[in-house]
Amino acid sequence: MNSEDYLNRLLPHRLDALAIAVLMLKFRMQWEEPKSMQIYVDHRLQFEGMTTMFTNPALEVGVLHARALLEFMGLKVVSGILVQAVPNSRRSDDATIEKLTGPTGPLSLVTPEEAGAINPSDPEGAKQALAQTIVAGHKGLAHSSATYFSKPVQAESILLALQVTQQLIERYVYLPLGRQRPPVPIEARPRE
């Protein structure tokens, strides 16, 4: 793994996808139904349609990137429970947190307890939301599973998981490396 490339290119790209998904999910949760939408590029109308043409793919991409980041940090799901990956069970070509080195040595895998502690008011809820989001990315998006579609994840759980994932990266990657997270490249304005 090329650590500098991962930290300077791929990690910010994944975090941008999460930030955009969080923003879109917050908007979508405010709307009772899809709204009409126009997208302008360089002050010219380029796309017209319903909000779902943008929000749905943005959310799906965010869930997939969250799954990848959680796996990068050493978290996975076994029998519906968030658990820590066994370090030597990971493939040699996987991008993993323990391949990054800070001033005090290699970074450590994140434990489920550390992941839950990001949300001190409900650590178990945070762990459950993360587990559900990993499963959603795997069984609902990367693969098609009939059992998943009978019980999809609630929007509130996905929102919590996306936000917790961002905070985990900040706390367990950027902070130990003495780096700042790059700024989010999108702004939104409230509707009038």
Each language-model region and where it sits:
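Charged alpha-helical initiation segments
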Residues: M1-M53, Q154-E192
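Short, solvent-exposed segments of well-ordered alpha helices
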Residues: D5, Q46-V63, P120-Q128, P152, ...
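A structural signal for well-ordered alpha-helices, especially hydrophobic packing surfaces
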Residues: V22, A66, L70-M73, G137-L141, ...
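Short acidic alpha-helical/loop segments enriched in Asp/Glu that coordinate divalent cations
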Residues: M29-D42, Q46, L75-G102
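Short, hydrophobic, well-ordered secondary-structure elements
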Residues: T55-G80
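Charged, amphipathic alpha-helical oligomerization/scaffolding segments
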Residues: V61, A68, A129-A136, L160-R171
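Long, hydrophobic, amphipathic alpha-helical segments used as structural scaffolds
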Residues: M73-G80, L141-P152, V173-Q180
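Histidine-centered, metal-coordinating catalytic motifs and their short helical/loop contexts
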Residues: T101-K151
